[in-house]
Structures are given as C-alpha cells and as structure tokens.
A protein has these predicted regions:
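Terminal amphipathic alpha-helical/low-complexity segments used for targeting or macromolecular assembly
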Residues: 1-58, 62, 173-216
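Structural signal for interior beta-strand "rungs" in well-ordered beta-sheet cores
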Residues: 59-166
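Short, well-ordered secondary-structure micro-motifs
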Residues: 169-170
Length: 216
C-alpha cells in the first residue's frame, strides 16, 4: 500500500477535503498515519532512536501519539488526530476508522503483548478507550466515550463504561432485509405505469373514433 492509497482513503471517508492536494496538505490524521508508517519501517529495522524521533515530531505536529511498534493495516483512517494514542503492541486491521481522543492502551508494564488487537472494518468513536491485550472483532462499532476492557465478538455495537454489547448485527438478516426492500413494489412507479397505460388506451380510443368519423 502506497502513501497515495492513504490519501485516497481520506478522500473516501472525509467529505471535508475537496481535492487530493488538500487532503495531503491539511489532514492531520493522514499526516499521523503517513509518519507512523515511516517510523514503523525504521522500528522494524532496529533503528529505534530515529523511529522514536519521527514519532516525537509526529506527536508535536498532529497531536496523535502512535508508537512506532504499533501495526496499522491498510485503509486505516484517523479523523481529527488530536488526542489519539496507540500503544507499542497494538495491532489495527484493515479499514478501521478512529476518531479523535481514542486510546488503544495497555494495563500492564510487562514486555509482552499488552495492547488491543482491532480486527478489520471497526469504527471507534471519539474519546473511546480500549485497554489491555484484548481483541475487538470484525465490523464492531464502539460508541463515543466508551471504555472497553474485554474481548468483543464480531458484528456488534458496544457502548458505555464499561463497554457493553447493545446491538448484534446479523449480516445475513441485513442482506435479506435489503433484498426484500428492493423487491417490494414501488407505489409511485406503479401509479405512473397505470397512468401511462391509461393514456395509451385513451389515445387508441381517440384514434378509433377519428377513423369512424371520417367514414361516410
């Protein structure tokens, strides 16, 4: 994934930037992601001090503190980077949306996996906190201000302190509901069809009457 893909991700999910160049120049969340990708590569090569230096200036410039050791997948979108904190052993999957003030933190000082794993297609609302070596399943939505401290299964919505599942999303049920909705008749379309049919019938009757009147 190139830096251009990260810019396109911003354009797809944020209506504010009007152009590629505007997103590239002024999106703090994008800057945080791009600078992290650079620092992460250096971190993996063992160039820890340079990686941490980039991390430091990224925090100063964007307001987001993303440890160089954290792993961010493709299509990660940070909207309003201010206050975002992502710890060293955090793993963030593909197409994850992160809003301002989000913390992916640890509850231990042990030299081991101590930060959350966020699966694909997750949305984390503003000022939500996810703590510990826990896993957030695919397609989960975490409400603004929530505090999550335990594993969350896929396809649910979580809110509150501590975070509780309030909505279970059944993808197959949603698909069938959409199919049924699409298959339902459109009253307006049916009415227009009836009107057009009536006009055709009237036109034929008028034509027939005109032909009869022409006969001697």
């Amino acid at each position: 994934m190139s830096w251009r893909d990260d810019v396109l991700t911003v354009l797809e999910r944020d209506p504010a930037p009007k152009s590629f160049s505007e997103a590239l120049m002024f999106s703090q969340g994008l800057h945080a992601v791009l600078l992290h990708r650079i620092s992460h590569r250096l971190y993996l090569r063992g160039q820890y001090k340079i990686a941490r230096m980039i991390n430091y200036w990224a925090r100063v410039l964007t307001g987001a503190d993303i440890h160089p050791g954290a792993k961010l997948g493709e299509g990660v979108f940070i909207d309003h980077a201010t206050g975002v904190v992502i710890g060293e052993t955090a793993v963030v999957g593909k197409n994850v949306n992160i809003f301002q003030g989000v913390t992916l933190g640890g509850v231990s000082t042990a030299k081991e996996k101590r930060h959350p794993t966020i699966r694909d297609n997750v949305t984390i609302g503003a000022h939500a906190t996810v703590l510990g070596n826990i896993t957030i399943g695919e397609n989960v939505k975490i409400g603004a201000g929530s505090v999550v401290v335990k594993d969350i299964p896929p396809n649910v919505t979580v809110v509150g302190i501590p975070g509780k599942v309030v909505v279970k999303r059944d993808k197959e049920r949603d698909r069938l509901r959409e199919v049924r909705r699409e298959s339902l008749p459109d009253p307006l379309l049916e009415a227009l069809t009836d009107i057009c049919a009536s006009l055709d019938s009237m036109e034929r009757r008028i034509t027939s009457l005109e032909e009869q009147m022409k006969k001697p």
